[in-house]
Amino acid sequence: MSLNTKQSDPINSILVKISIILFLLFSGWLLYDHFINRPLDVRYYLTANNAFKDKRYDISLDNYLKAYSYNPTDAYIIEGIARSYMELDDFENSLKYFNLAINTDQEFAPAYANLGVLYDKNKDYLNAIKFYEIALQIDQDLSVGMHWIDRLLYDVRTKPPTIMDRLFYLKDQMLLPEDKRILSIDEIDNEQINYEK
């Protein structure tokens, strides 16, 4: 049997055409479902996440609030609002939304971790320790910190301190006499990241 016979086989030609048509239909459906048929709260949430990662916190806050208007029971959306307020230095609103996220899902460890970061930024170290411990009790994976792939994608050249690192440091400092404590070092504190899941 020669190659020319295979190419002129009508069944082979029909099967190839059917395969191409099915591939195009399936790809079209996937694109439609992914981009067009996506619920509005998910669209706003993803836009907010991208803006947050690009450090455009006012845009992220606006989109998280839009997502929240469609889905007020999603802990991820609520916690995103709180993180945006935290980065915009609005302590009271950030605290309000972190507490709302925790009340919505009491097992959502990033809300506790980021609430600890909020207290840490505001120099309330005892509450920071408390919420870091709660976050680590719920999810030990938070002690690992930023994954190397994320560091590569977001061009983070040095490994930022984790909440476990910060927790140990704060606890060690609390053991010292008050006049010997160094609880805040701006260069290190500024490297501390927000936690996502």
What function would you assign to each model-found segment?
Residues K53-D54, E87, K121, D155, ...:
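Register position in tetratricopeptide repeats
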Residues I36-T73, G80:
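Alpha-helical segment of the N-proximal tetratricopeptide repeat
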Residues S2-L15, V144-K197:
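Terminal, low-structured helical/coil segments at or just beyond the last alpha-helical repeat
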